[in-house]
Amino acid sequence: MAKPWRIVDRADTAEGLLDLRQRGATDFLITIDGRVLMNSSATMSEIVLAQLACEPLKNKKNVSVLVGGLGMGFTLKAAIDNLPADAEIVVAELNPIIVKWCRGPLAHFSDRAVDDPRVKIVIDDVAALIHYAATKGKGHRFDAIIIDLYDGPHAGAPGRGGYLYGNQAVASGRSALKAGGVFAVWSEDPDKVFENRLKAAGFSVNRQRPGRGGRRHVVYIARKTSASKMNA
């Protein structure tokens, strides 16, 4: 019989009860109101997302990367592993308790990535940081923006979907990037509307589904290229 999940820690958030659950010695879940946000045994798409976004930056200088969503730290760890020693990595995370978990019971998954000297944790909405960079322009832009949030860009995403993945949000993401910068987005499933939105905003788009068989999530690697075709 499988061991039951136990609640390790819990916080009340605007979106509901945020739980860290553990089963046995190695299995962890992060859930919100019972919905699984992260599973420590299903991390391939998050890792590939960061690898594809950051590998082209390995030999560049003064690299700046924004990561939206900390989760269990797998995405951040993959970014660190593929960036130069002088890179700056800004992580936007809404819930301080997630940072606490990544320094505590989840620290071994990412080799304590949150404490890497290249990393700056900001307790804020990633959309606010993107808007700031887009507004301020040169000197504030990123080489890559990695969005690894549990909702993703699908049409049914509650609440935050539009302002993170809508026309204006995608245009803002493009403005927040340096020339040739990458806008990398995790998605639960393929979303042709979102893919077309990226292309219309002036991105070349590479869609991948890491893994083989079973449920495979989607990563969009969108590179800033031509001028936007959008009106908004």
PLM features per residue range, with description:
Residues 1-61, 81:
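Rossmann-like AdoMet
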Residues 22-23, 222-225:
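Active-site beta-strand termini and strand-to-loop segments that position acidic
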Residues 32, 140, 223-224:
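Residue-level signal for short segments within beta-strands and strand-turn junctions
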Residues 39, 73, 192:
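Loop/helix-junction capping segments adjacent to catalytic residues or to phosphate/diphosphate-binding pockets
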Residues 43, 47-177, 185-186, 201, ...:
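The AdoMet/dcAdoMet-binding core of the Class I SAM-like
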Residues 181:
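Glycine-centered, phosphate/nucleic-acid-interacting loop/turn motifs that mediate DNA/RNA or nucleotide
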Residues 189-201:
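Short alpha-helix
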Residues 225-232:
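Flexible, glycine-/basic-rich loop-and-beta segments that form/coincide
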